[in-house]
A protein has these predicted regions:
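Loop/turn-to-beta-strand initiation segments
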Residues: 3-5, 75-79, 155-156
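Class I SAM-dependent methyltransferase SAM-binding "motif I" and its flanking Rossmann-like core
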Residues: 95-153
């Protein structure tokens, strides 16, 4: 009988944030798959848990993933952890979860710490609709292309960023979204020096150019403001009907097409065309 996979979230800073259920799952698992076994070992030592650790990270996932699946299909239970937060979220565990589903293995996700949600809740930005964009590319061209694809995104956008890339990322964001776009920079969440700076992209660039950023950041960027739709006038309708008729359409067809294009009632377009 096949075993199970448990996705076990780990603290994003404060070790006191690990739940009793997570602790029990780690204790009862046959082995633990970890992104960095050195980081996970520190947590296990803190919890007083001795367990077999298997490394699973970006550069060995193709080989190790199959081996882990084989062990679970043979009846063992695996707990998957990342260095911090919920596994499989912007992390190599994503591919491992896909493998397990393809193999028909039962997957159980345990709720717990997640930097995305923690940052969003404390950001002061709109929380009703949001999108998580993960880490931006280290290559400027790819980073700009990613941001440009979000030019008209109206949902709140969330990104992870390292301190050494922060200023370059903020500069690209300002170039694409505008310097006045609101942003909340959430740093060292749940740790001793936790900080949330709610400002604009332009002001953030000034702040972190003068003061070198430290710690890991979650950037919560306000979405694009909703654009006001222009309402077509009777003159617009009359001009468009005339143009379409000059192109060969009958008056009836020109009125019908104009009404559709300008989102106006046919009778309004008809009256405008007769003026």
């Amino acid at each position: 009988m096949a075993g199970m996979l448990y996705l076990v979230p780990t603290p994003i800073g404060n070790l006191g944030d690990i739940s009793q259920r997570c602790r029990e799952t780690l204790e009862n698992a046959d082995f633990i798959a970890a992104e960095d076994t050195r980081v996970s070992l520190k947590l296990l030592n803190h919890l007083g848990i001795k367990k077999s650790l298997v490394s699973y990270y970006e550069h060995n996932k193709a080989f190790k993933g199959e081996k882990i699946v084989e062990r679970i299909l043979a009846g063992e239970t695996c707990a998957l952890v990342s260095d911090a937060g919920s596994p499989a979220i912007s992390d190599p565990g994503e591919d491992l979860v896909k493998l397990w589903h393809e193999a028909g293995i039962v997957v159980c996700a345990i709720p717990g710490p997640c930097a995305v949600i923690t940052a969003l809740s404390i950001s002061g930005q709109a929380t009703g609709r949001f999108c998580f964009e993960g880490f931006l590319s280290t290559a400027k061209k790819s980073r700009r292309e990613h941001l440009e694809s979000l030019t008209n995104e109206q949902r709140t956008m969330i990104f992870y960023e390292a301190p050494h890339k922060l200023v370059a990322t903020l500069q690209d964001m300002a170039a694409v979204f505008g310097e006045d776009r609101p942003i909340s920079l959430c740093r060292e969440l749940t740790k001793l020096h936790e900080e949330v700076v709610r400002t604009t992209l332009g002001s953030a660039i000034e702040k972190y150019t003068e003061n070198a950023p430290k710690g890991e950041f979650v950037l919560v960027v306000a979405g694009a403001p909703e654009q006001e739709k222009e309402v077509a006038t009777a003159d617009d309708a009359a001009a468009r009907v005339q143009q379409l008729m000059e192109e060969g359409l009958s008056r009836k067809d020109a009125i019908k097409q104009t009404a559709k294009e300008l989102n106006l009632p046919k009778n309004v377009v008809y009256d405008a065309a007769l003026q």
